[in-house]
């Protein structure tokens, strides 16, 4: 008798950054900008591949990329994929003042709402670099999950607040009990893969 195949679950997500990450680092000359344009070349191929295999996934997109490539972003939505928040202009929140971070977060939410008809529930920080205020802001704006941290390979976990990082002694971990915010790579209800 052949052994039954195990059901395996994989999470596939994409960051459609285009040139935003390069521009956010001050790389605005023609060469890095052209390198960033390749995302727009690859995206239709990725959408076709996902369609071919019946895969629904999540695309994390900065607001400026939605403004730069509206038709491609509309194609993502039309194909039934989730659009997650990936900053306004791909500037890492850790490099922003708290009010700048909140302004970019709110602006990105509104742009995604215009694109999809609803506020995003998922967030992936530009350059995977959260600020000390990021978790508080994500909770304030009703996010369900964030997808920037990497403390576990496949199990969702609660995001902590209040970590204290020291260079001269051990790390002090903050508290995750009150956040309710998950760090996961997919939305459980949408993909039926992770039950929390």
What are these regions (language model features)?
Residues 2-122, 127-196:
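Catalytic alpha-helical scaffold of carbohydrate-active enzymes acting on polysaccharides/glycoconjugates
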């Amino acid at each position: 008798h052949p052994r039954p195949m195990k059901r395996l679950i994989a999470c596939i997500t994409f960051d459609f950054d285009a040139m935003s990450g390069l521009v956010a680092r001050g790389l605005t000359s023609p060469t890095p900008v052209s390198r960033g344009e390749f995302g727009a070349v690859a995206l239709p191929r990725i959408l076709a591949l996902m369609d071919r295999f019946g895969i629904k996934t999540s695309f994390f997109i900065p607001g400026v990329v939605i403004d730069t490539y509206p038709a491609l972003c509309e194609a993502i939505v039309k194909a039934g994929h989730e659009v997650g928040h990936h900053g306004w202009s791909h500037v890492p929140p850790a490099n922003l003042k708290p009010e700048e971070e909140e302004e970019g977060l709110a602006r990105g939410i509104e742009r995604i709402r215009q694109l999809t008809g609803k506020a995003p529930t998922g967030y992936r920080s530009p350059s995977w670099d959260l600020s000390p205020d990021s978790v508080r802001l994500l909770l304030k704006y009703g996010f369900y999950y964030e997808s920037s941290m990497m403390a576990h390979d496949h199990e969702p976990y609660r995001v902590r607040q209040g970590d204290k990082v020291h260079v001269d002694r051990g790390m002090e971990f903050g508290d995750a009990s009150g956040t309710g915010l998950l760090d996961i790579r997919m939305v459980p209800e949408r993909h039926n893969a992770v039950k929390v």
